Amino acid sequence: MPLPAFFEPLLCEQYGPELAERIVEGCRARRTTLRANALKATPEDVAACLDEAGIGYERVDWYPDAFVLAADTQLRDVWALPLYEQGALYLQSLSSMLPPLALGPEPGLDVLDMCAAPGGKTTQMEALSGGRAH
């Protein structure tokens, strides 16, 4: 949520221009991000689907399954995608994609995700293990 205009000069006065700008930037709307569900689609499948729908995106260097959508993308446009309806792509923040990558789940690993709601990291761990984690 953007900060009210009158608040920005107060931040500058209190914290200085550099930190104030970082605070203001942190309050701006974030772009929508999603990941390919590797059990149902490749990143190339997702890219082709987004291209066909005219949805702009950027790829993420550190995770090939991740996509950052163009700022003008509406969620309803994503919800209407065939791959979304099939569960082949998942709306998930980039920061939420990091823990499963750090864990590196392997086939046969038993995982108890005690914070699973709505389950994005859990489904990502399942995909990273090739559908063979428990």
Which residues does each PLM region occupy?
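S-adenosylmethionine
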Residues: 1-134
